[in-house]
From Swiss-Prot:
<dbReference type="InterPro" id="IPR054691">
    <property type="entry name" value="LeuA/HCS_post-cat"/>
</dbReference>
<comment type="pathway">
    <text>Amino-acid biosynthesis; L-leucine biosynthesis; L-leucine from 3-methyl-2-oxobutanoate: step 1/4.</text>
</comment>
<dbReference type="Pfam" id="PF08502">
    <property type="entry name" value="LeuA_dimer"/>
</dbReference>
<dbReference type="InterPro" id="IPR050073">
    <property type="entry name" value="2-IPM_HCS-like"/>
</dbReference>
<keyword id="KW-0479">Metal-binding</keyword>
<keyword id="KW-0808">Transferase</keyword>
<dbReference type="InterPro" id="IPR000891">
    <property type="entry name" value="PYR_CT"/>
</dbReference>
<feature type="binding site">
    <location>
        <position position="14"/>
    </location>
    <ligand>
        <name>Mn(2+)</name>
    </ligand>
</feature>
<keyword id="KW-0963">Cytoplasm</keyword>
<comment type="subunit">
    <text>Homodimer.</text>
</comment>
<feature type="binding site">
    <location>
        <position position="202"/>
    </location>
    <ligand>
        <name>Mn(2+)</name>
    </ligand>
</feature>
<dbReference type="GO" id="GO:0003852">
    <property type="term" value="F:2-isopropylmalate synthase activity"/>
</dbReference>
<feature type="binding site">
    <location>
        <position position="238"/>
    </location>
    <ligand>
        <name>Mn(2+)</name>
    </ligand>
</feature>
<comment type="function">
    <text>Catalyzes the condensation of the acetyl group of acetyl-CoA with 3-methyl-2-oxobutanoate (2-ketoisovalerate) to form 3-carboxy-3-hydroxy-4-methylpentanoate (2-isopropylmalate).</text>
</comment>
<dbReference type="InterPro" id="IPR013709">
    <property type="entry name" value="2-isopropylmalate_synth_dimer"/>
</dbReference>
<keyword id="KW-0464">Manganese</keyword>
<feature type="binding site">
    <location>
        <position position="204"/>
    </location>
    <ligand>
        <name>Mn(2+)</name>
    </ligand>
</feature>
Length: 509
């Protein structure tokens, strides 16, 4: 019988530390709901003491989820712990995650504390947290660069003070398989408690070993894995939870352990995070990449056609990838479109389907066939526009002279107010973005601009992601359209709209 491995998702906390990623309030809530649908055991919803926005997001998630534990991060500070309590007190299963650094380099250069000071702080703050929470998780930050005897003391101190979950973070992705497994084995054998203690692994991917080390931790006695969807996170990212889960599923013969994830929701969860983070999943990404179930070699194709298991160790359907796609066309009606939405796992009311069907017909008139990926793109684009405080209404371009272009942009807010401005630039994109900047009356820096095609072919829809720096804050925008310039403008407007929404601003004019 397989043992249960808990999944602790930190996409909304550690994942959001990815450069250029800044989820909006609505996006955080939608992500949390999808993570609950995916079946994660715990969601680290944020760091409530860090900002008002983080506090409100954690609070909303705690008040919304019904089955998943909601966790907030806290330093060894009573004010941090109080903030987590206030944010999560309405959760079905509130959890506080208390941490302090323990490695020599952190003690000397960051904390300016002795080992005795750290042990005293752990005892004081875990004890305090236990007065407010039934479940307290403790993490010795930079554990893998901490002397093992001192690490044992830190963990024993936390357990004695009431912690029942101990997380061992490989904060800078420094450890390797055998070493990390040994740390867990040592702790499980050395630390004593009358309570059941769950050991948790938290790995970063700086040396490309986050998933491998997470699996090694299970071999060493860990019963919880922490990570993010698609492996997003600061620097090289975190352990990709979908990879950990499928490794346990496929190699259950070795690990003898399983998660409780609804694996068929894996691809949908990955796509949602990719879209909101503005980070495209690499085509060759394990489990959820576009090429994960593709076979180019003739020998491989022949083998798969004869028997799929010759070159596939798991089925696409297992993770929610459809392989029985029946494209729609310009003659497809509302019923066929509605049935396609159901087949793709969408539960959309009839009123919303009317607008989506109009968008579908517009694309169908321009393409020979409309694929499932096109349908996903239509819905994704519609969701973004529906959530946005402002959206693109019209865009007009005109050639001026000497290589200059003129752009007239019209934006509409949720109340129906119209904002219009124009500008010129050395090319269409520059002209468009100058005009949008004028509408929102903000000076911006374009950090990143990426175009991807939703499908193959010259008639494919364009998917544009932008990252902007506005008043020292990074925001991302996303736009989909059959026209690249329209998609580019939508993405830029969305980035501005996100900034305005987070800062409760109204545009000028």
């Amino acid at each position: 019988m397989s043992s249960h491995i808990q999944i602790f998702d930190t996409t909304l906390r550690d994942g959001e530390q990815t450069p250029g990623v800044n989820f909006t309030f609505d996006e955080r809530l939608r992500i949390a709901l999808q993570l609950e649908k995916w079946g994660v055991d715990v969601i680290e919803a944020g760091f409530p003491a860090s900002s008002t926005g983080s506090f409100k997001s954690v609070q909303a998630i705690a008040q919304t989820l019904t089955t998943t534990a909601v966790c907030g991060l806290a330093r060894c500070k009573k004010s941090d712990i109080d903030a987590v309590y206030e944010a999560t007190k309405d959760a079905a299963k509130p959890v506080v995650h208390v941490f302090i650094a323990t490695s020599p380099i952190h003690l000397e250069h960051k904390l300016k504390m002795s080992q005795e000071d750290v042990l005293a702080s752990i005892k004081e703050h875990v004890t305090y947290a236990k007065q407010l929470f039934d479940v307290v998780q403790f993490s010795p930050e930079d554990a893998t660069r901490t002397e093992l005897p001192f690490l044992v003391k830190c963990v024993q101190t936390a357990v004695d003070a009431g912690a029942t979950v101990i997380n061992i973070p490989d904060t800078v992705g420094y450890s390797y398989h055998d070493e990390y497994a040994h740390i867990f084995k040592t702790l499980t054998e050395s630390v004593t408690s009358s309570n059941e203690i769950i050991y948790s692994a938290h790995c970063h991917d700086d040396l490309g070993m986050a998933v491998s080390n997470s699996l090694a931790a299970i071999e060493g006695g860990a019963r919880r894995i922490e990570g993010t969807v698609n492996g997003i996170g600061e620097r090289a990212g975190n352990a990709a939870l979908e990879e950990v889960a499928l490794a346990l599923y496929v190699r259950n013969d070795h690990y003898g352990a399983q998660t409780a994830l609804n694996l068929e929701e894996t691809k949908k969860t990955s796509d949602l995070i990719s879209r909101y983070a503005g980070i495209r999943v690499p085509r060759n990404k394990a489990i959820v990449g576009q090429n994960a179930f593709s076979h180019e070699s003739g020998i491989h194709q022949d083998g798969v056609l004869k028997h799929r298991e010759t070159y596939e160790i798991m089925t696409p359907q297992l993770v929610g990838v459809s392989t029985t796609e029946l494209p729609l066309g310009k003659l497809s009606g509302k019923h066929a479109f509605s049935e396609k939405l159901k087949a793709l796992g969408y539960n959309i009311d009839k009123e919303a389907q009317i607008d989506l069907f109009k968008q579908f017909k517009t694309i169908a008139d321009k393409k020979k066939s409309v694929s499932d990926r096109d349908i996903h793109a239509i819905i994704q684009g519609s969701e973004h526009e529906h959530q946005a405080l402002y959206k693109l209404e019209t865009l007009q371009l005109q050639y001026v002279s000497s290589g200059l272009q003129s752009a007239v942009v019209v934006v509409k807010d949720k109340e129906g107010h119209i904002y219009q401005d124009s500008s010129i630039g050395t090319g269409s994109i520059v002209a468009i973005y100058n005009a949008v900047d004028r509408i929102f009356q903000k000076e911006t820096e374009l950090i990143d601009y990426r175009i991807n095609s939703v499908t193959e072919g010259t008639d494919a829809q364009a998917e544009v992601h932008v990252n902007l720096l506005i008043e020292g804050k990074t925001v991302n925008g996303f736009g989909i359209d059959h026209d690249i310039l329209q998609a580019s403008c939508k993405a830029y407007v969305e980035a501005h709209a996100k900034f305005a929404a987070e800062n409760v601003e109204k545009v000028g004019n």
